[in-house]
């Protein structure tokens, strides 16, 4: 007899707790913003998920790759003699704009 009363109280307690938990979760999910549309924030979130090496437009190129990039960008060899573009782009990262301003400023 005592066992059945304890079992009935336990079942009632479990049903009440489950009902409260379900209501709490429903209220919590209702407070979340599902239709949040901000393209700038979304871009930054996607941007931060990308690998660090792919985030910027600067690239690290060394050796003959620099010569090929200069040939493509300038249509010939680097006209600037005071800067070593190959060493600079290998040690530090360069953008395409850096290559064009340093090697062929007339372009």
UniProtKB/Swiss-Prot annotation:
Chief localisation class: secreted
Domain of life of the source: Eukaryota
Propeptide feature ranges: 20-55
Gene Ontology BP annotations: dauer larval development; negative regulation of dauer entry
InterPro entries from the UniProt entry: Insulin-like_regulatory, Insulin-like_sf, Insulin_CS, Nem_insulin-like_b-type
Gene Ontology terms, MF aspect: hormone activity
Secreted as UniProt keyword: yes
Disulfide bonds: 62-90, 74-103, 78-104, 89-94
Keywords, comma-separated and alphabetical: Cleavage on pair of basic residues, Disulfide bond, Secreted, Signal
GO cellular component: extracellular region
Pfam families hit by this protein: Ins_beta (PF03488)
Compartments, record wording: Secreted
PANTHER family to which the protein is assigned, alphabetical: INSULIN RELATED-RELATED (PTHR33893:SF5), INSULIN RELATED-RELATED-RELATED (PTHR33893)
Family stated for the protein in its record: Belongs to the insulin family.
Protein name: Probable insulin-like peptide beta-type 3
Organism: Caenorhabditis elegans
Originating gene: ins-3
């Amino acid at each position: 007899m005592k066992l059945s009363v304890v079992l009935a109280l336990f079942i009632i307690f479990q049903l009440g707790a489950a009902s409260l938990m379900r209501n709490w979760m429903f209220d919590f999910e209702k407070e979340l913003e599902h239709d949040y549309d901000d393209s700038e924030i979304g871009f930054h979130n996607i941007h931060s998920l990308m690998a660090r090496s792919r985030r910027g437009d600067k690239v690290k190129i060394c050796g003959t790759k620099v010569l090929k990039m200069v040939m493509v960008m300038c249509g010939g060899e680097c006209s600037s003699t005071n800067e070593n573009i190959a060493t600079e782009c290998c040690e530090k990262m360069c953008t395409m704009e850096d290559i064009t301003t340093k090697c062929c400023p007339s372009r």
